[in-house]
Swiss-Prot record:
It comes from Marinobacter nauticus (strain ATCC 700491 / DSM 11845 / VT8). This is SsrA-binding protein. GO terms for molecular function: RNA binding. Required for rescue of stalled ribosomes mediated by trans-translation. Binds to transfer-messenger RNA (tmRNA), required for stable association of tmRNA with ribosomes. tmRNA and SmpB together mimic tRNA shape, replacing the anticodon stem-loop with SmpB. tmRNA is encoded by the ssrA gene; the 2 termini fold to resemble tRNA(Ala) and it encodes a 'tag peptide', a short internal open reading frame. During trans-translation Ala-aminoacylated tmRNA acts like a tRNA, entering the A-site of stalled ribosomes, displacing the stalled mRNA. CDD domains: SmpB. It comes from the Bacteria. Its main location: cytoplasm. The keyword Lipid metabolism does not apply. Keywords: Cytoplasm, RNA-binding. GO terms for biological process: trans-translation.
Length: 160
C-alpha cells in the first residue's frame, strides 16, 4: 500500500490569466500539451509562472506560446542557460490547429492562454479563441457582475 503525501496540493492549477476574462469574449477552449525543459518543470512545481501578456502564435502548422514567464529556481542546473521568456511549443492535433488557424484568420479573433495546470504528471495549457471586448462591453459585464452580487446579498438577507 502506498501512502498519500501529507502536503499534496489541493489544486492542479499552476497559473491563471485573470485578465483574459475581462479583456476578451471567450468563444472556444482547447487543451494543449506543453513542450518544456527540466528546469521549467521544476519551476512550475514551485508555482513560478505568469501568463499575463502571453499569447499563441500560429506558424507553419504549429502553435507556439509566447510571452509567458517561467521564473527559474536558484537551484536550477548551471550548465543550462535558463531563459524565462523562452518560446514554448504547444502540442495540439493537426485538426485543432487547422480550426484555430481558420478562426484567427477571420477578423477580430485571436488565441490566448487561459491557464496552466497539471493533468496527471503532465503540464497542460488551456488556450482559447477569443474576440476583443469594447469598452462598453467591459462596463456592461462589470454592471452585470455587480447586480448579481447585489442580488445574492439581498437573497441572503431575506433568508435570515
Amino acid at each position: 500500500m502506498s501512502k498519500k503525501k501529507a502536503n499534496a496540493p489541493t489544486s492542479n492549477t499552476i497559473a491563471l490569466n485573470k485578465k483574459a476574462k475581462h479583456e476578451y469574449h471567450i468563444e472556444e477552449r482547447f487543451e494543449a500539451g506543453l513542450a518544456l525543459l527540466g528546469w521549467e518543470v521544476k519551476s512550475l512545481r514551485a508555482g513560478k509562472a505568469q501568463l499575463v501578456d502571453a499569447y499563441v502564435l500560429l506558424k507553419d502548422g504549429e502553435a507556439w506560446l509566447l510571452g509567458s514567464h517561467i521564473t527559474p529556481l536558484n537551484t536550477a542546473s548551471t550548465h543550462v542557460i535558463a531563459d524565462p521568456t523562452r518560446t514554448r511549443k504547444l502540442l495540439l492535433h493537426a485538426k485543432e490547429i487547422a480550426k484555430i488557424v481558420g478562426q484567427v484568420n477571420q477578423a477580430g479573433y485571436t488565441c490566448i492562454p487561459l491557464a496552466l495546470y497539471w493533468k496527471k504528471n503532465k503540464v497542460k495549457c488551456e488556450i482559447a479563441l477569443v474576440k476583443g471586448k469594447k469598452l462598453f462591453d467591459k462596463r456592461a459585464t462589470e454592471k452585470e457582475r455587480d447586480w448579481n452580487r447585489q442580488k445574492q446579498r439581498i437573497m441572503r438577507e431575506a433568508n435570515t
